[in-house]
C-alpha cells in the first residue's frame, strides 16, 4: 500500500481497497475519542506543572510518581527511557552533565490525550556527556514536550528539541 499525504481529519490517502478500509477505521476511531472534561484538563495540567517543578528541584521520586508508568522519549537523540530504573539512570546521567539543569515554562496546550508544553531548557555543562568533556558553558534551548495521558494517568513524556542548538552553545 502506498501512502501519499495527510488529508482532512488525520486521514491518509491510500491507493488500494485495504487503504480505504484503513481510512474508514481511522476516521471512526478519531470520532470515538472523547474530548476531556474541564476537570480532567485541570487535573492533567496540575500534574504536568508538578512534574516540571519537581524536575527543577531534582526531586526525581516525585517526577517518577507523576507517571502511571515512567517513560521518556527523547526524539532528537533517538533514546527511550522506559520504567523507573531507566528513568532514574537518565536523570543521573543528564544531571551529572548539567547539575543546574532546569526548565522555564513558556506555554501549555491541551489535546484529547496530551498536554503539550513549550519550554526553555537551560543548564551548564559541568560533567561528561556522551564522551564530551565539560566545557563550563551554558545552554538555553526552546523545546516541546508531549505529556501523553490515558485518562488522567501520565504514560509518557515525549520531548522534541534541536540537539545542534545545544551542542553549538556548548562548543562555540
Question: Where are the language model's segments positioned?
Answer:
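Residue-identity detector for glycine
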Residues: 8-10, 19
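Cysteine-centered motifs
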Residues: 12-14
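C-terminal and inter-domain tail/linker signature
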Residues: 27-172
